[in-house]
Amino acid sequence: MSTEEKLNIFTQKLLEWNKIHNLTGSKSEEEVQENIEDALFALQFLPDTIQNALDIGTGAGFPGLVLAIAMPKTQWILTEPRQKRASFLHYMKSILNLSNVIVYKKRVEQIEAVPMDLITSRAVMKTKDLIDLSKKFITPSTTLLFYKGENLGDELKGMEHYSIFERGKRKYLLLKGDDVI
């Protein structure tokens, strides 16, 4: 199954589940597609050497599950403490045969510390709190990619080394481990 086919199945299943379980605010195929494009846009900023990745608060699959589909050679850990969303992620892992994905129905604080090449998160909490939660997974070469909104500037006070990329209202914050540990 191609990446495109997997993303199409993900879209349809998310819309089906969302009618019953209210997994995401995206209610139409267009809205889900926009969220997929939002997740995939960041691929151009990532190194191609990523072996493993952690997504904090995966929710209905953005960005972690979408990136795991697009990056099949990268081992992904998706953390989602809410039962209905974790169940959906397990279901998608199964029907899409995503052998590169591990889903934990836990908060990231409850996950065993393993050095990560990439840490992602979207709309979970403020940047400094995300960094603090991530510290046990960060090495000097870790890339941190946080999907943020328009008010990112307030969160960067006191930080010196970072890159910001924009797409519409989305701001992608890119940090290196050696700048935050």
From Swiss-Prot:
Highest taxon in the source lineage: Bacteria
Catalytic activity from the UniProt record: guanosine(527) in 16S rRNA + S-adenosyl-L-methionine = N(7)-methylguanosine(527) in 16S rRNA + S-adenosyl-L-homocysteine
SUPFAM superfamilies documented for this protein: S-adenosyl-L-methionine-dependent methyltransferases (SSF53335)
Residues the entry annotates as binding S-adenosyl-L-methionine: 57, 62, 108-109, 122
EC annotation from Swiss-Prot or TrEMBL: 2.1.1.170
Keyword terms of this UniProt record: Cytoplasm, Methyltransferase, rRNA processing, S-adenosyl-L-methionine, Transferase
A family per Pfam: GidB
CC per GO annotation: cytosol
Gene3D superfamilies in the record: Vaccinia Virus protein VP39
Subcellular location field: Cytoplasm
InterPro entries, alphabetized: rRNA_ssu_MeTfrase_G, SAM-dependent_MTases_sf
Gene Ontology MF terms in the entry: rRNA (guanine-N7-)-methyltransferase activity
Record carries keyword Cytoplasm: yes
Family: Belongs to the methyltransferase superfamily. RNA methyltransferase RsmG family.
Protein function: Specifically methylates the N7 position of guanine in position 527 of 16S rRNA.
Protein name in the entry: Ribosomal RNA small subunit methyltransferase G
Protein species of origin: Nitratiruptor sp. (strain SB155-2)
This protein's encoding gene: rsmG
